[in-house]
């Protein structure tokens, strides 16, 4: 398992994939692209190999746990809801907005905490201007060949456009079972995905709300892009604590040049009252989405928090295109454990 965290995660792009013309997904079937991508598959096999080293009973247990995380399309959604889009149990009340696939309100009854306009799914595409700004903000050697290739996209097409896809029209489906309900927002119309499902899971007797975002048929772009999931408290001035390596830090109290715009975290506490568990997406941007804007400003937390679900903005040894189906889980519950 330790091999999966090695810094050189696959072949180095600037050495093994010098292909300035190959940016369209249909081009990735050529020999050089297949060789390049094979190094990522090799690294992903480390997880499978780790499972195979376990005793049979433990291996079977691990396989079952991993399979539960595998995204599956819910093709049997039956009850379509078009009005009265307020759902609740004794712990939460949520009001959904199918016009942009968000929750207008997530209200926690135990502590009267409220989120607004939350659960927003955003995709953004970057252009050359983004990288030029970032190069001079971030690189200590901004004119070195290796640094330019590692941290920017010098060969990206000049006509690559900066775009943002924010929210989307959905259908709403309700599924009820003996001990709770699941409300699902669904679209098959997103320009970068064949299908997106966002589940709001409300068990009757559990004090948490789980939001589960699943995507299917993602376009495997080489062009730089990112996907985000956002939460925004209604209260404009909230305190935040991020848990990193089991230490709690304040995102507004980070040393100058200490990486104020992005954090890898285990979970977070908002306003000393709410625990947010980001079970599958450790990278979070406080205040605003920020990948290629290496500002040294203290983040304005009025903008909420934004979890990065995917990006391919760096060069070096990481997957430069990715089309897998994915699941991301977020749990929200009251917090009183200091």
Where are each of the predicted segments found?
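Catalytic and substrate-binding regions of extracellular carbohydrate-active enzymes
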Residues: 3-217, 322-326
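Residue-level signal for secondary-structure boundary sites
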Residues: 9, 193, 221, 315, ...
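Acidic (Asp/Glu-rich), glycine- and aromatic
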Residues: 113, 205-247, 337-338
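Short structured motifs
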Residues: 167-171, 184-185, 195-199, 261-263, ...
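Preference for bulky hydrophobic residues occupying beta-strand positions
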Residues: 185, 200, 229-231, 307, ...
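Polysaccharide-binding surfaces and accessory modules of carbohydrate-active proteins
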Residues: 227-289
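Beta-strand-rich recognition/accessory modules
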Residues: 270-338
